Amino acid sequence: MEIRVMKAEDYDKLYELLMTIKGFGIRSIDDSREGVARFLKRNPTTSMTAWDGDTLIGAILCGHDGRRGCLYHVCVRKGYRRHGVGKAMVVACMEALRKEEINKVTLIAFTKNDIGNAFWNKIGWTEREDLNYYDFTLNEANITAFIEED
């Protein structure tokens, strides 16, 4: 397995991987080729990919605003889970954030994502129960489509 920084050229394999993750939400604008390229241009060193030869087996979009980092779309291809791929990518993202003097990183996990929530707890992340999460949609055209569950 090789962990490396995500590049815009990885998009086709990234999209194919995301489409295999059941229950995953893909946004029509943010997760388009242009949306991912825009994110990577703003955060050129912090998003990671995991490879087994030419096969993309994991990916994390990771960025920051100068104060706090955030992980988006953390995923590992089925069949490669529970082999350290996710943890290796998370560690690489956190190291990249530290180099940019970011001191804290957050993520959002759906409450129904039992596998993901178990993973974050296992690797030492803290679930916050002292705050509420709010969002506001600025572009109604940025539609989220969820990958069908089996």
Task: Please state what every model-predicted region is.
Residues 1-14:
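A short beta-loop-alpha structural element at the N-terminal edge
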Residues 37-49, 70:
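A short helix-loop-beta-strand connector motif used in the catalytic cores of GNAT acetyltransferases and
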Residues 49, 55-63, 70-75:
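Conserved beta-strand in the GNAT
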Residues 63-72, 81, 128-131:
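A conserved beta-turn-beta hairpin within the catalytic core of GNAT-like acetyltransferases
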Residues 74-81, 109-110:
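A short, internal acetyl-CoA/4′-phosphopantetheine-binding micro-motif in the GNAT/acyltransferase core
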Residues 82-95, 122:
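Conserved acetyl-CoA-binding loop-helix of GNAT-fold acetyltransferases
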Residues 87-88, 111-130:
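Conserved active-site alpha-helix within GNAT-family acetyltransferase domains
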Residues 97-109:
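Conserved GNAT acetyl-CoA-binding A-motif
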